[in-house]
């Protein structure tokens, strides 16, 4: 009998890549507990915490401006669907968490889009999800950026262009037209 028929097909893991930036990224203590550029497998039922508490958080962010537990990530499967996703929940009472431009207060949670910017305090985290087909575990890979991930684009305000050549508004009686 052919042995290839008995071999399980290998499933790909969903991978969440988190590129992190902080203005004081040179400070060795800030990201000391995070192994950069290494994928870490995480069981699907695990809740992954980020924050200042080294004993509770799998990914410690050692800054006085970060809450003890800032936020957590959790892998889940949609109801009546085989696709998996990752949700983020703000666990900080003092710091708001922003996912793209959506503000999350304490205990608010949302599903992470495939690519988004997570911000709190001075931290910027670019999150990119590569979907896999395994629902038993997923991977997180952390990268460190030395440049800001948020680009402030200055767009000068444009002056409106009048349709009829006059720069000031002119009132016209509706019967005078």
From Swiss-Prot:
Protein name as it appears in the record: TRAF-interacting protein with FHA domain-containing protein A
Lineage: Eukaryota, Metazoa, Chordata, Craniata, Vertebrata
Gene Ontology terms: cellular component: cytoplasm
Family listed: Belongs to the TIFA family.
CDD domains tied to this protein: FHA_TIFA (cd22714)
SUPFAM superfamilies on file: SMAD/FHA domain
Function as written in the Swiss-Prot or TrEMBL entry: Adapter molecule that plays a key role in the activation of pro-inflammatory NF-kappa-B signaling following detection of bacterial pathogen-associated molecular pattern metabolites (PAMPs). Promotes activation of an innate immune response by inducing the oligomerization and polyubiquitination of TRAF6, which leads to the activation of TAK1 and IKK through a proteasome-independent mechanism.
Keyword annotations: Cytoplasm, Immunity, Innate immunity
Major location (coarse): cytoplasm
Gene Ontology biological-process entries: cytoplasmic pattern recognition receptor signaling pathway; innate immune response; positive regulation of canonical NF-kappaB signal transduction; protein homooligomerization
Subunit-level organization: Interacts with traf6.
Location of the FHA domain: 48-104
Cross-referenced PANTHER family: TRAF-INTERACTING PROTEIN WITH FHA DOMAIN-CONTAINING PROTEIN A, TRAF-INTERACTING PROTEIN WITH FHA DOMAIN-CONTAINING PROTEIN A FAMILY MEMBER
Subcellular location as annotated: Cytoplasm
InterPro entries with a match to the protein in the record: FHA_dom (IPR000253), SMAD_FHA_dom_sf (IPR008984), TIFA (IPR033621)
Alphabetized Pfam families for the sequence: FHA
